Amino acid sequence: TPEVDTKKIVIRQTDVNRPALQFAGYFEYFDYSRIQLIGKVEYSYLKMHDDDYIREMTEKIFKAGIPCMIFCRGLEPRPLFMELGNKYGVSVLATDDGTSSFFSELNRFLKIELAPRISIHGVLVDEGVLITGESGIGKSEAALELVKRGHRLVSDDVVEIKKTNNDELIGTAPDITRYFIELRGIGIIDVKTLYGVQ
C-alpha cells in the first residue's frame, strides 16, 4: 500500500497477532494495537469464504486501527486488502519468510526496539562494566586502560541502556559517539582505528 503515509503509523506493542479468530468473527479481547500476521492458516480460511464475508471481517480489523498487516510465505494479498488498507491508512506488507520464523524475528526485533530505555552519563566497557561518576574524574582514562588490556569499548560519555526483559539490560552508544573516546589533554580518539574491533 504505497499510498499509506507510514510516518503516521505508531507501533507501541511488542506482541504480534495472527487474526484467525477475527476472520472467524470473534472480536472479544482483540488487541488492535498489535501487528497482524497472515500465514497459510488464515489465508486458506479466507479462501473458503466469499468476497462479501472477507470484506466485512477485514474491514472490522482495519477499522479497529491496526498498525499494519503482513502476509508471510510469499502469499499475495487480494486487491481488497490493498483497497481497505488505503481507505483506513493501514500498511499491507508481504514477506517470503515462513510465518513462524518471521513471527519470532519480528517479536524479538520489537522487544529490543520498543524496550524501555534511559541515557546516563558514564563509560561502558564490554560485559557490563559501567563506570559512572562526576565529570572530569577520569572515567574515559580508566576505560582506555581496560581497552588496552583487551576489553571492548561500548560507549563513552553517554550510554543508552535498554531493558529488553526482566533480567537483561543492553547498553549501546549513540551513533554520533560510537567508537570514539574523549581524553582530557589529548582530545577525541578513534578507539576502533587504534585498537581494532573484536
Each model region followed by its residue ranges:
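Gly/Thr-rich phosphate-binding loop signature of adenosyl cofactor/nucleotide-binding cores
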Residues: T1-F62
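Catalytic-site beta-strand/loop segments enriched in glycine and acidic/polar residues
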Residues: Q36-L37, T58-R73, I118-I137
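Fold-independent oxyanion-binding glycine-rich loops
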Residues: G39-V41, R73-G74, D96, E127, ...
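Hydrophobic/aromatic ligand-binding patch that stacks against planar heteroaromatic rings
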Residues: K60, L84, E145-L146
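Residue-level detector of anion-binding/catalytic polar loops
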Residues: P67, S91, R152
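Extreme N-terminal, non-catalytic leader segments
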Residues: I70-R73, R78-E127
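Glycine-rich phosphate-binding P-loop
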Residues: E127-V154
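Conserved nucleotide-sensing/catalytic segment adjacent to the nucleotide-binding pocket
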Residues: R152-Q198
